[in-house]
Amino acid sequence: MLRRFAVIGNPIVHSLSPVIHQMFAQQTQIELIYEKILGDDVKFEQQISDFFIQYGNGLNVTLPYKKRAYELAKVRTQRCTLAGAANTLWMEENQLHADNTDGIGLIRDLSRFLELKDKKILILGAGGAARGIIFPLLEAKPLQLIVANRTLEKAKELQRQFPQINVTSFAELTEFFDLIINATSASLSHQVIVLPEEVLSHKPFCYDLAYNQKTSTAFVQYARNRGCEAVDGLGMLVEQAAEAFFIWNNIMPSTKEILEQLRSF
């Protein structure tokens, strides 16, 4: 029986999710359709309701609706609750369920490059993207997790929820790290958070949650120009999609060759 999935967001035209899920479908021999839905700021909740009334099996949610999807759900996973945002929805026993697969997607992609245990990790930015990855990063048992933001107060809000982290402002960054994660939106507008030279002097591994299929993001290029190994978030996108696919279909697809295909497009 043909299963129906979609991703909703605004903008949505450039989403790679339909391509990724069709690749998963071919690999696992599941018949499905996966559509793009342009989110309507006024009618978003009605759009969610209509999708499932019309026999939708699962829905991915992207910017700017993850918080509204979270609030709409009746049942949430622990990681979804801690993230305060949802990117994966489905119906079960007539109740809307929600999960957030971004964090596990990041961890799985990062594991290709380095071990997180006992590492010093810096997250740039204290918005929703940062909040969504803190819990899974803490589960990996780093030596230290620091969140840096332009305004310290916003970082302190995260610290109140996650007391295990330390916070600072960009201006006060002085120490070195093993891993730096850009969770700001700067790359989306081709801008860079300029870091003090001493922060990059030990050549930390640098990871940008944003991705650009054709070229490097601004942050990745900035880090590479300073001698650091750096990658963008395309692998995270594929891994979070695989986790959503597993939630909906109870089959975990293989991601390595799909990521390689996307990189070669």
From Swiss-Prot:
Active-site residues, record numbering mapped to chain: 66 (proton acceptor)
Origin organism lineage: Bacteria, Pseudomonadati, Pseudomonadota, Gammaproteobacteria, Legionellales
Protein family (similarity comment): Belongs to the shikimate dehydrogenase family.
EC code(s) of this entry: 1.1.1.25
Identification of the protein by name: Shikimate dehydrogenase (NADP(+))
Record GO cellular component, one term: cytosol
Gene coding for it: aroE
Metabolic or biological pathway: Metabolic intermediate biosynthesis; chorismate biosynthesis; chorismate from D-erythrose 4-phosphate and phosphoenolpyruvate: step 4/7
Classification via Pfam families: SDH_C, Shikimate_DH, Shikimate_dh_N
Organism: Legionella pneumophila (strain Lens)
GO molecular function (one): NADP binding
Positions with a binding annotation for shikimate: 15-17, 62, 87, 102, 211
Alphabetical keyword list: Amino-acid biosynthesis, Aromatic amino acid biosynthesis, NADP, Oxidoreductase
Function according to Swiss-Prot or TrEMBL: Involved in the biosynthesis of the chorismate, which leads to the biosynthesis of aromatic amino acids. Catalyzes the reversible NADPH linked reduction of 3-dehydroshikimate (DHSA) to yield shikimate (SA).
Binding site for NADP(+): 125-129, 149-154, 209, 233
Gene Ontology BP annotations: amino acid biosynthetic process; aromatic amino acid family biosynthetic process; chorismate biosynthetic process; shikimate metabolic process
